[in-house]
Amino acid sequence: MTSFQEVPLQTSNFAHVIFQNVAKSYLPNAHLECHYTLTPYIHPHSKDWVGIFKVGWSTARDYYTFLWSPMPEQYVEGSTVNCVLAFQGYYLPNDDGEFYQFCYVTHKGEIRGASTPFQFRAASPVEELLTMEDEGNSDMLVVTTKAGLLELKIEKTLKEKEELLKLVSVLEKETAQLREQVGRMERELSHEKSRCEQLQAEQKGLLEVSQSLRVENEEFMKRYSDATSKAHQLEEDIVSVTHKAVEKETELDSLKDKLRKAQQEKEQLECQLKTEKDEKELYKVHLKNTEIENTKLVSEIQTLKNVDGNKESMITHFKEEIGKLQSCLADKENLHRALLLTTSNKEDTLLLKEQLRKAEEQVQATRQELIFLAKELSDAVNVRDKTMADLHTARLENERVKKQLADTLAELQLHAVKTDQEKTDTLEHELRREVEDLKLRLQMAADHYKEKFKECQRLQKQINKLSDQSASSNGVFTKRMGSQQKVNDASINTDPAASASAVDVKPAASCAAETDFDMSAKDHVCEVTKEMAEKVEKYNKCKQLLQDEKAKCNKYADELAQMELKWKEQVRIAENVKLELAELEDSYSLQLAEKDKEINCLASFLENLSREKELTKSLEDQKGRKMEGQSPQQVSRCLNTCSEQSGLLPTLPAAQPVLQYGNPYTAHETRDGADGAFYPDEIQRPPVRGPSWEDNVVCSQPARNLSRPDGLEDPEDSREDENVPIPPDPANQHLRGHGAGFCFDSSFDVHKKCPLCELMFPPNYDQIKFEEHVESHWKVCPMCSEQFPPDYDQQGFERHVQTHFDQNVLNFD
């Protein structure tokens, strides 16, 4: 066996044209239709032709007969086209037992497609008859035709089909109901999901609002921590001041000791003066010493004065610290008010109030500590005043400063209270004043609107009167002109000169009076219209201002109402959302449990239906197998002897997987009626061994057709190649060595069993049919007849078949 070469079917020349519905055999003298498909890999030509070749051909000249391939109508390049050719019966070969195949040859002489092999055989009358047992449970055998048996089977299958259709309609109705239920549940689930998503979005909004409130609370806490840190810093400053005061007190004690020592020394000096009056020198020295001590005391007094100055600076520092504390208290009070205005949460306000109360207590404690320190300082000053007279003034000043500080603190507190009260009073007064102003403006606007309306009516009446007056004046003027014309006509005949002068004067006077009246009327109308326009503009402005004031009032009222109701609504919404989420979770859990139960019920129902179908199928199979009777022994013996004498089994290719355009090397199985009695869906047809063709195959070139295809040599030249033996194929020799295949002996009266599918057959079953069934499990190469096991790879089998065409490349040069 040669090595296989991987060649895709798309690139093979023999797969460009696919022959469809090729039978295993055809009648010799009957018309034959050839169906084939042109793939996108071939471009048709008007000189392309389809020929019948004997299997084993070597060149395109080895055709038996051919027909020109018609050019497809409306052909589009790159598309697939189905074509049909009809071969006449008198051009076809006779029943010679040879295998033939269709080949598509292009105008260049290239073979681009080949069909599966087939034979030309005449039908025998024995093959059309069948024997079967009588249905009346008698031992009689009934001989019928295949057509009758097939009609009975068709009637049975139609009845079964009707029953199955009824069952399918019932099942379809049930499935439609189940689908409706599932769709309804899915719609409910989608509705619930959308509702859940909406609630989740609302919850996210509430969480964002709470987060913003938390951020504000954190900011207030930071401010409070800053204030507490400042208070701690002030406490530390107070502690440092107390330490300094203690140090000063120790210094005062040391000064007191020094003063006592000085007094003792002075007493000693006085004693020495009394005792030693004579010793002037010593007295002078003693005076010098006393002067020195006095200077020291003066310096000490100066130092004490400096200390007093330091105390004053400390007092000023304390005043500044007290001012800072007061500013901190004011800031805390402002923060407290801001918190009361901004936050409506009761718990937060209580916490902040508690924190403010603690801070106020701490401030009060610091104030008390300051008072205690002031008292201690006053005590120290009193002691110092007792010891030194010079420091008495400082003590008085210190007390005065303390009084001033207390006064200032009291004044500041009173001022803060007064300012707060004044602010509230001013706000209330301003709001009341604005409300009263708005009321007055509304009243004034209403009065003004009434006045303007009255003025408009009055002016409208005046305009109507003026228009009437102008119309009447025009009528009078026309009448006067007519009468004047008559007077002028009468005076022409009497006194021409006088009449002429009168005519000249009177018309001029009448025209001047009329024009003056019209001008005054027009001026009056213009003034009235201007006044009306100005008043209308003023009215519109007042109306606009009134609307603006109303809008502002409504806006302020709405904002206050919204600020009051906002937090309550948020709290209520949050509680409702929590309750709804809990209810939704419970409802979802219940719905899921119910749907799981329904799904389990449907699954169990479908399993029961499938089991019932399988049981009905198995019962029908058993009934069909029981209905099949045993064939008569005489017919089986005759058929067995015929098969033993012939010894040749036809090779039938196995069923292959479906390709894109069909496999050109697989035959469409056309099972006869007898084989169809044993469930053709379960019976397959691979071969056991290849056909025992002769080693020396003679290729002849018949001259039936008068015309020959273009591009080929003269048929007379090809006749020289007749009777030339073709060397035997090594694959065929290999198969002949193993040509025994399966040995079927019909002499044993036992049930026949397929060695591959383990299907049981009756003892008298046709041996040829049984062998064909066993052969149907195997795969046979259509070129070399090599057999392959049933589980052999389909691609490997196709590669093997392709190697035969690759090894025998055709040359037309």
From Swiss-Prot:
Q: What is this protein called?
A: Tax1-binding protein 1 homolog
| Entry's localization field | Cytoplasm; Mitochondrion; Preautophagosomal structure; Cytoplasmic vesicle, Autophagosome
Q: Tell me how this protein assembles.
A: Homooligomer. Interacts with TNFAIP3. Interacts with STARD13. Interacts with MYO6. Interacts with TOM1; the interaction is indirect and is mediated by MYO6, which acts as a bridge between TOM1 and TAX1BP1. Interacts with MAVS; this interaction induces MAVS polyubiquitination. Interacts with TNIP1. Interacts with TRAF6; this interaction mediates deubiquitination of TRAF6 and inhibition of NF-kappa-B activation. Interacts with RIPK1; this interaction negatively regulates RIPK1 ubiquitination. Interacts with NBR1. Interacts with TBK1. Interacts with RB1CC1. Interacts with SQSTM1.
Residues annotated as region Disordered?
667-732
What is the role of the protein in this entry?
Answer: Ubiquitin-binding adapter that participates in inflammatory, antiviral and innate immune processes as well as selective autophagy regulation. Plays a key role in the negative regulation of NF-kappa-B and IRF3 signalings by acting as an adapter for the ubiquitin-editing enzyme A20/TNFAIP3 to bind and inactivate its substrates. Disrupts the interactions between the E3 ubiquitin ligase TRAF3 and TBK1/IKBKE to attenuate 'Lys63'-linked polyubiquitination of TBK1 and thereby IFN-beta production.
Q: Which GO terms describe its biological process?
A: apoptotic process; negative regulation of apoptotic process; negative regulation of cytoplasmic pattern recognition receptor signaling pathway; negative regulation of toll-like receptor 4 signaling pathway; protein localization to phagocytic vesicle
- Mind telling me which Pfam families this protein's record contains? CALCOCO1, SKICH, Zn-C2H2_12
Q: Which residues form a coiled coil?
A: 144-596
User: Which residues of this UniProt protein bind Zn(2+) 2?
Assistant: 781, 784, 800, 804
Give a yes or no for keyword Zinc-finger in this entry. yes
Q: How is it modified after translation?
A: Phosphorylated in the C-terminal region by CHUK/IKKA leading to NF-kappa-B signaling down-regulation.
* Region annotated Oligomerization, chain positions: 320-420
Q: Which GO terms describe its cellular component?
A: autophagosome; cytoplasm; cytoplasmic vesicle; mitochondrion; phagophore assembly site
Where, per the database record, does this protein carry Phosphoserine? 124, 138, 225, 618, 631, 692
Query: What does the entry's free-text domain comment contain?
Result: The C-terminal UBZ-type zinc fingers function as ubiquitin-binding domains.
**Chain positions of all zinc fingers (UBZ1-type):** 751-777, 778-804
